[in-house]
Amino acid sequence: LWMVGSHSLKRGKAKATYDTKKNLELLGKVEPDANRFFLGCVFLHKNKNNQFRLSLSESDNNTRAAQIRCDATTSELLDEIRRDTLFTRFCDKNGGIPGKDNGIDIEGLACTRNGRVLVGMRGPVLRGIAIVLELAPERIDSPNTKADQLQLTKIGPTGLKYRRHFLDLAGHGIRDLCWDGDDLLILAGPTTGLDSPPLVFRWKAARKAFGKMSSDEEKFIWRSENVLVQQSLGSTGKQAEAGADHAEAIALFDKKHLMIGYDSPSTKRFHKPASVIVDIVDL
């Protein structure tokens, strides 16, 4: 089970209930959040009923949790992003642009069959182009700690510890990633807090495309009928409500349906304690 933090800076949020002075202070406050600089995994055990449970072992090297080097202000991944000439204007060691202002903001994760990890970038969107980073983490046994270390390896043509894939998502950033067979489903949305209906793009045969790429290759994936298309979604759930219901996550419900979860869900989605209504849409 893989997890990734946004690696973004956060800006204070103005509110109608505050006076002008307080709102100006909030908008001028940009700071890191230690919980955001994380990439790691925990091992899952599968029983005979196809149910999974987390492995909490600290001794078995094959099932120990693992994470990349990180602290309260950065990580191995963010250090690499800062070295990337495409992103240096968005982040440096002295600060940067907050995530919700089209700064660095990671959302969405999917794994390939050869051990690579794909992370989607909600921002920055560069002149309408969204970016997926392909990572190749390697586990390093760390017997004197509670978790092993993951180390990113250099891949791709840039000498960085990731390879970039550039996607034409009509100006939207990436909110989540999900495999559907060999196709990669991409939940897209604004880099800021704008309202938007759920948008899902299908990168056809993406799994095969990764396998065919040479080690020194990066590609632009343009919208076309045979490669990258926007999905037509037939909703069988509640419709997204303006001012709320920001599509945040997707997962296959079955072979013909996709489940969509929302950040800041409408109050209409809460019908009993400890539960929330999501949408099931036709693929």
Model regions and ranges:
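Sequence/structural signature of beta-propeller domains
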Residues: 1-283
